[in-house]
Amino acid sequence: MKLLKFGGTSLANAEKFLSVSSIIEENTQTDQIAVVLSAPAKITNYLVKIIENTIKNNQILETVHLAENIFMQLINNFLNIQSNFPHKEIEKIIKKEFNELKNIIQGILLLKQCPDNIRAIIISRGEILSVFIMKSILQSKNYNVTIINPVKNLVAIGDNYLDSTVDISESKKNIQNMNINQSNIILMAGFIAGNKDKKLVVLGRNGSDYSAAVLAACLDANCCEIWTDVDGVFTSDPRKVPNARLLKSISYQEAMELSYFGAKVLHPRTIEPIAQFKIPCLIKNTNNVKSIGTLICEQNCSEKDFLKGVTHLDEIAMFNISGPHIKDVGSVISRIFTMMSRGNIKILLITQSSSENKINFCVYEHDIYKILYLFNKEFQLELKDGLLNPFKIKKNLSILSIVGSNIYKKHNIASKIFSVLGALKINVIAISQGSSKHSISLVIKKENILKAVQHVHNTLFFNKKTIHMFLIGIGGIGSTLLNQILKQKQFLDKKNIEIKICAIANSKKILLLDNTNDLSNWKNDFKKSTQKFNLELLNNLIKNNHFSNSVIVDCTSSQLLSEQYVNFIDNNFHVVTSNKKANTSEWNYYKKIRKSVAQTGKKFLYETNVGAGLPVIETLQNLFKSGDNLICFKGILSGSLSFIFGRLEEGILLSQATREAKELGFTEPNPCDDLSGIDVARKLLILARESGYNIELKDIKIEPLLPNNFKIYEDTDKFLLKLKELDVYFSNKIKQALNVGNVLRFVATIEQKRQFFIKLEEVNINNPLYKVKNGENALAFYTNYYQPIPLVLRGYGAGNNVTASGVFSDLLRTLS
């Protein structure tokens, strides 16, 4: 025996009714089939609306006609699809049902209310008509059909007309006494049962699924299939978490936990009978019959797939009960549970403080006023005598739950969850582990639940580490960085690293990207973008940031942008920058950035500020962490000047060498910054501050390469033209040095007596800076550990490729 249950969306029209009949036919080849049917989609909602409109005496007949027309249109469509369908017979049944409904409505109009027993009769009409229609379809295909009347055979416990529970033992006896022919297809309306007086009652929310589970138990079915409009149970709601995965199988206990904490596929009551009688339950999709679905069974899940889902409940309120004189907290909890049970109120989660004088529990917000009334009545004396404090209520909360087999045995699950929430700046208000040890639940603000679910899910179910990158500046460095990221995609995929480019901007406009954008075509997409860029837009993007690992990448030389770094960091962004302006601003701002980093746990990475792709900053920081101290520093910190002076040695004129350096991407946007020495001074300032010196840019003495009276042009072409006036002067200086076996180098120096200066020096062949040219940088650190031979870092210190690679490296360091 196999039981099949079909939901309302599977019966929404004539075509879907026939699809369901085909599924039933196919299954009859191997098993006897019992079928439980819901009302067609929308019908139950219309029937509820009929009751509401009747009580208000508003648009009654219009709503009745809407519901009736769904059925009439449905059976009319059968005429075009299946010629032998008994259209007239079913039409009579439908009209009879709706005529009876209209008579019932007259009684409601007189009473101006709808008793529960009448409400149950009205809202269950859809299921009954579904059975009549399916019976006619199957009989027209020459199948023998037996209809089980749930009012006569499913025995409801108690007198609740709208949310009954079935006595499976008694119901089983009734159904066995029917002696149903084994060759017949069994049909039964879902959602319905009968009380001890054989009066119709309904089974509450998701009652048709519950009916199916009950009937499966009564028939000793070897399988229960729930056919719906989704492929099965997912690791999270696919509408909210697009990369949620279909679960092939889950245990009864896991299914119970998932449904209890918000998963929509099955109601906990549905799982109870199939778990009790160990009936495997398969969730299938009528719109995708080839999908394997999800099997719910007794077998424990494999160790590999111990995590099963991330789900949530919304519209939650948390009550806080406390008092300085609670002597017996167990008694208080007992009274709370008794009181809530009497009021038919569900406690979703409960926690108790270690001091045993405070209890928190969560309920649905719609129960708040009912609870307050019951509490004030139950604890009237304790409140009056000050033994209990006035109750505190927190609203607008959600419960985030993580479900899996023996989740408590996995020591790193909680740490991963808290790490994600911490990165998102989401505070956990309460935490609880289910008594079944199959779930962990956390209470957070409702406004944070969507991003919490998405990021916790992605962290737990995917090993992939994600960076959400906002790139500002797409000149030489920025565009090269994008090309490097594209080139390294396969390598990053192997390392389970994903870099998502969320925005690309320059000083004029911004391109916002999503997962559908093809990054290989970013230049054309950027040209087409019409959205103007400004700091206000950027700040709005930042405030609405829902990502756990977001990075602002600054590849500009903008002072204004650098002044926003504290704001970026405080709003949950890492900052990676090739822009030296922030680190060379006033000391107070320099410290303010680092204070924000310390407070937020975000990263501020600027390796390229001094040596482009050379590991200068990290090396220096690691030296100091290990207890070393700087004694003296000598370095060539300008790749552009390294290139220029190398070319001068080869007989190239200054103006020509400078133009070549700019064309190769070695210089700043205006080469004047390089030749003035100010760019080197900024780098030396950064090194000095990293070494513990509290200094400003003005404390660095610069002996400029350019004469004091040399006119500076902001226009690059004019500046390079003007530079020709110095060609002969520098050619002569180079020759003088070479004549005595020396070379000219523009050297930055830190000496122990707080001496910081930059000047053009002659260096001999024994100096570590002697052979440095062609765009190389060289940094010689004399420290307690490295003397008399210094620690020397040497390599290309300018150029788009090496600088972009340094930024790329910093970007990846945000994951550590």
Swiss-Prot record:
The active site is at K683 (proton donor). The keyword Transferase applies. NAD(+) binds at G476, I477, A505, T556, G799. Residues 472-816 are annotated as: Homoserine dehydrogenase. NADPH binds at I477, T556, S557, S578, K580, G799. One of its GO terms (molecular function) is NAD+ binding. It catalyses: L-homoserine + NADP(+) = L-aspartate 4-semialdehyde + NADPH + H(+); L-homoserine + NAD(+) = L-aspartate 4-semialdehyde + NADH + H(+); L-aspartate + ATP = 4-phospho-L-aspartate + ADP. One of its GO terms (biological process) is methionine biosynthetic process. Its EC number is 2.7.2.4, 1.1.1.3. Pfam families: AA_kinase, ACT_9, Homoserine_dh, NAD_binding_3. Pathway: Amino-acid biosynthesis; L-lysine biosynthesis via DAP pathway; (S)-tetrahydrodipicolinate from L-aspartate: step 1/4; Amino-acid biosynthesis; L-methionine biosynthesis via de novo pathway; L-homoserine from L-aspartate: step 1/3; Amino-acid biosynthesis; L-methionine biosynthesis via de novo pathway; L-homoserine from L-aspartate: step 3/3; Amino-acid biosynthesis; L-threonine biosynthesis; L-threonine from L-aspartate: step 1/5. Residues 402-479 form the ACT domain. Residues 1-250 are annotated as: Aspartokinase. L-homoserine binds at E668, D679. NADP(+) binds at I477, K508, T556, S578, K580, G665, E668, G799. Its cofactor is a metal cation. A sodium ion is seen in the structure; a metal ion may subtly affect the relative position of the nucleotide-binding region to influence enzyme activity, and could increase the stability of the enzyme. Homotetramer. Bifunctional aspartate kinase and homoserine dehydrogenase that catalyzes the first and the third steps toward the synthesis of lysine, methionine and threonine from aspartate. This is Bifunctional aspartokinase/homoserine dehydrogenase. It comes from Buchnera aphidicola subsp. Acyrthosiphon pisum (strain APS). The lineage of its organism: Bacteria, Pseudomonadati, Pseudomonadota, Gammaproteobacteria, Enterobacterales.
